[in-house]
């Protein structure tokens, strides 16, 4: 009986270590995501000299933190819409998904290639779950919804950018380029603020969803509500990563 009890305690400790490993990897993913995707928010503003690079990065870091704290809708989607049930996965599966996503992010950062951390994470989860448990464990409806958003995002943005540019040319086409540049620089700062805030409110929540899903599958929490400490940790990791800055990708952009 004593030996059996010792084995149970050891198994429980091993499970706890794996959960904390996932927490560490998820925060590492958030940190890397911060400096990997910083360019998305500030590349245009920096390239046109609307704002100094250091000021742009610090502004983006602060707004990423604030954005990460506003809601948990994306976190619940990541935590609840990809897998049919939290009981079907474990910390080892989630660790594999995170390691795959982190590796891809680091490679693309090293090569200076802009890429989506969201695509990497979603692909890592699907691959790890499909290999270890089987693709039947995946929530088909949830994955279709996520894939549609990933595919449609650049298409909708491209169409929106084309339409807005057409309208701007019709309104301001006759103005002097010098006058326009001065006025639009301030508007670029506003757009960078909006981009940074939305980046934090979207991307930081992916790590929140991963950690919350792990805590739920391990029996540490009872619902898919994101704990406050998870929000704070993910927001801080994202902000710190952003403060470091991804100069290679900014140069490419």
Describe each PLM feature range.
Residues 1-9:
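Single conserved hydrophobic/aromatic residue that forms the stacking wall/gate
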Residues 10-252:
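Multi-pass alpha-helical transmembrane bundle typical of ion/small-solute transporters
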């Amino acid at each position: 009986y004593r030996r059996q009890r010792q084995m149970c305690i050891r198994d429980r400790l091993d499970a706890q270590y794996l959960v904390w490993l996932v927490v560490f990897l998820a925060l590492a993913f958030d940190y890397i995501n911060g400096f990997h995707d910083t360019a998305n928010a500030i590349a245009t503003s920096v390239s046109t000299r609307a704002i100094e690079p250091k000021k742009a990065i610090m502004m983006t870091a602060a707004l990423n933190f604030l954005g990460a704290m506003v809601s948990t809708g994306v976190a619940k989607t990541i935590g609840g819409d990809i897998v049919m049930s939290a009981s079907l996965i474990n910390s080892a599966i989630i660790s594999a998904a995170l390691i795959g996503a982190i590796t891809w992010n680091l490679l693309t950062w090293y090569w200076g290639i802009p890429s989506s951390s969201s695509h990497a994470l979603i692909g890592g989860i699907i691959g790890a779950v499909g290999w270890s448990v089987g693709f039947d464990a995946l929530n088909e409806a949830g994955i279709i919804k996520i894939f549609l958003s990933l595919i449609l995002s650049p298409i909708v943005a491209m169409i929106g950018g084309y339409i807005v540019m057409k309208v701007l040319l019709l309104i301001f086409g006759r103005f002097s380029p010098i006058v326009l540049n001065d006025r639009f620089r301030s508007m670029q700062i506003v757009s960078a603020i909006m981009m940074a805030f939305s980046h934090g409110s979207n991307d930081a929540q992916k790590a929140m969803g991963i950690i919350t899903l792990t805590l739920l599958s391990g029996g540490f929490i009872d619902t898919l509500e994101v704990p406050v400490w998870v929000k704070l940790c993910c927001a801080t990791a994202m902000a710190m990563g952003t403060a470091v800055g991804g100069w290679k990708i900014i140069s490419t952009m």
